[in-house]
A protein has these predicted regions:
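Short glycine/acidic-rich loop motifs that flank beta-strands on beta-rich extracellular proteins
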Residues: 98, 109-112, 132-134, 140, ...
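Accessory end-domains appended to solenoid repeat scaffolds used in host defense
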Residues: 402-408, 413, 424-432, 478-484
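Glycine-centered low-complexity coil/loop motifs and glycine-rich tracts
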Residues: 332-335, 364-367, 392, 430-432, ...
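Active-site glycine-centered loops adjacent to acidic/histidine catalytic or metal-binding residues
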Residues: 8, 34, 281
Length: 519
């Protein structure tokens, strides 16, 4: 039996009969086609306050610097691969004790550029490194690559451009620039976004930047644009400082995460602006080869981005994130432990295209990781559908017997959250016999988007224990405020939520929760 409180057409009934049969629901996806380089209005965010984040007049000591123009580079010619020339300049700088390699005087098309120890890559104002459109020019699945290096840096105020449009398929629909005329159910909102995704073409080269097993790494005063996949992949590194970086991606290119910290510790991300299609800032820690997420393309050479140890001491503050999916996320790849994470004084939003972003804050352990001591505070959101999604499941994406049922989420503190135009309640979801522990939420001020409430009644919300974890996969939840299932020691204090005026849903729905405190 399905009871609808709005909508009486047969087509609406048929579209939502999947409430009882979730396996019948399939995500929209385009698998084949030609490269589609055209840019629609709404693909890029056109109001990035670069002057707030980028210092175009930053003084830099260029005494004894190495200039790429002395190594035969040819600017402003998209048919020329300048990677060999730039790599020769970097090698020369490294072999003479290190220093600064200067990219100036134009835009340089490149395949993979390799950083080396004790070298800072400086991209001057009005200059850039631009990804070649020939996938054969990339030898390590990234435009900028470093491995086993120390004391390296990349700075601007110039740009690194990934040319993501040239490695993607045509979307089914162009960006939606106006709100929907009526309230859609959560699953339909998910599909409306997916119809606008530029899914990967088989030629996709990989990351804009992959920095692997490096120590003492700095990215600062730099503009990154139009990544074809993850923009910054910091993998198995230690002592990382990312500051005053502006990321401006096409907001419909699949898997174009902003900053992904994978298996790395002692990381600071501050004063950054990120506008992207996929996760804004993500923390991941997995054992095996990455497949680049739910819609990922296994990139050539089966690139190993394996993380081999627990990660800790991550501090993120004073950042702005525009994301069509998750603004801040722990997950999904989570087979090894993540702990001691602080996120504060950030803004998460998506206010100029529709539908809303998936979630503002997402904390997940789905492959066996112990996620512990996560502290998030002073966050403002607008048009992020779910303000907070905490999910413990048992996907075990690495297929390791020792990880089966090992995962934990404990000691989570989220305070002082203000969010407008939400669509989904706070969700805290473990699985049977495997609970989330010790979650403290305090001082939330949440307001639903305008419109009539959409509501479908189901006797049972599926566990989806082995599925990809995302809040909108559970469709409409029968509570507007808080949904808690399989949890213990949960504290909710001063959680204010303004629902839609006509809602039939109750404030909370609690299933299998021990020691719940509401003040």
């Amino acid at each position: 039996m399905i009871i609808y409180f709005r909508g009486d057409s047969v087509s609406r009934f048929i579209n939502h009969i999947g409430s009882f049969f979730p396996k019948l629901q399939k995500d929209f996806k385009i698998y084949t086609g030609d490269i589609f380089p055209d840019v629609y209005v709404g693909d890029f965010y056109d109001k990035i306050p670069y002057e707030k984040y980028i210092n175009y007049n930053l003084s830099f000591n260029l005494d004894n610097a190495t200039y790429v123009k002395d190594f035969g580079v040819i600017p402003d010619n998209s048919c020329v691969n300048n990677a060999i020339c730039i790599n020769n300049a970097i090698t020369k700088c490294n072999e003479t004790g290190g220093g600064v390699v200067v990219v100036s005087g134009g835009n340089y098309t490149c395949g993979t550029v390799y950083l080396k120890s004790n070298v800072i890559l400086y991209i001057d104002k009005d200059s850039s490194i631009v990804a070649s459109h020939n996938t054969n020019d990339f030898t390590d699945n990234a435009l900028i690559y470093a491995e086993n290096c120390e004391n390296i840096g990349i700075t601007g105020p110039g740009k690194i451009c990934g040319e993501g449009n040239y490695f993607s398929l045509k979307p089914y629909c162009p960006p939606k620039l106006e709100p929907f005329s009526e309230t859609l159910d959560v699953w339909s909102l998910r599909q409306e976004y997916r119809k606008r995704i530029r899914f990967p073409h088989k030629t996709k080269y990989g990351y804009l930047m992959l920095l692997k097993n490096c120590n003492n790494l700095k990215l600062y005063n730099l503009i990154l644009e139009n990544s074809a996949m993850w923009t910054v992949n910091i993998n198995s590194c230690n002592s990382v400082d990312i500051s005053n970086v502006a990321i401006n991606n096409n907001r419909h290119v699949a898997n174009s995460d902003g900053i992904d910290i994978c298996g790395s510790s002692n990381v600071v991300i501050k004063d950054c602006f990120i506008s992207t299609a996929d996760d804004g800032i993500a923390l991941k820690n997995n054992m095996s080869v990455s497949t680049s997420g739910d819609d990922g393309l296994k990139i050539k050479n089966n690139l190993d981005v394996t993380c081999r140890k627990g990660m800790s001491n991550i501090y993120i503050h004073d950042c702005e994130v525009i994301s069509c999916t998750n603004a801040f996320k722990i997950g999904t790849e989570t087979s090894l432990d993540i702990s001691d994470v602080t996120v504060e004084n950030c803004k998460f939003y998506l206010t100029d295209i529709y539908p809303a972003g998936v979630s503002g804050i997402s904390i997940e352990s789905c492959d066996g990781a112990k996620v512990n001591n996560i502290n998030i505070s002073n966050i403002e959101m607008n048009s992020m559908a779910c303000p907070l999604f905490i999910r413990l499941c048992n996907r075990n994406g690495d297929n390791k017997p020792e990880l089966e049922g090992r995962g934990e989420i404990t000691n989570i503190s989220v305070n002082n959250i203000k969010a407008d135009n939400i669509e989904i309640p706070i969700m805290i979801m473990g699985i049977p016999n495997h609970k989330i522990h010790d979650v403290n939420l305090k001082n939330f001020d949440l307001r639903y988007a305008e419109g009539k409430d959409y509501y479908d009644f189901r006797f049972k919300i599926p566990e989806q224990e082995k599925e990809y974890p995302e809040c909108n996969r559970f469709r409409n939840i029968n509570a507007y405020g808080v949904f808690v299932r399989h949890a213990e020691n949960i504290s909710l204090e001063n959680i204010k939520i303004k629902p839609r005026k006509n809602t039939f849903r109750k404030y909370k729905k609690i299933i299998d929760c021990k020691n719940l405190s509401i003040k």
